[in-house]
Amino acid sequence: MKIGLSKSIINHAGFVYDAVDQGWYNTLKGHNLFFIPNTLNQDFNVMANDLDSLILTGGEYAEQRSEVEQALVNKMTEHNKPVVGIAESAFYIAGLLGGELEYIEKHFDINHPIFYHREVLEVNSHHDKCIKSLPNSANVLCLDYLGNVEAFTHGNLAGIVWNPEKMEKPWIPPEIAYMLRI
């Protein structure tokens, strides 16, 4: 599978870099990875046609990155291909669907339990937001201990609020792994 991965924008020593967490190499082992440049000067239609799926990786908000991701998400949905948002990008996908987001306290740089069907799993949290609700048409897969949405699908769109690439044993809900064909 050819999986597109968006990249964070890092400012360091007066220079601007695109970057991706190296944990994705292990998480997506055996797949062809294509890293999306943070520039609008590219053909998103051709890119969407070439990719099998797209992962919007986590990371801090940057306007340029956001514009690139929006352009590619639009083309991926036109091509009926899966798009999965991770962490901050899960909030973006939830917002597209009309989900309700809120700030949450004591949820930054911690591990916490989530509920997947009848299983309790531990995941990480590197954010101070939560998804309070999604439209009824969304399929909620995981909830945290406060009842906030931690993973969901909606057609070819999905979100995972934690960072699977930062886990010792990366875990992606099977429904989303199936969408990505991983």
Specify the residue positions occupied by each region the protein language model found:
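N-terminal beta1-alpha1 cap of cysteine-dependent amidohydrolase-like domains
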Residues: 1-88, 95-102, 107-120, 128, ...
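A recurrent flexible, glycine/aromatic-enriched loop bordering the glycosyltransferase active site
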Residues: 123
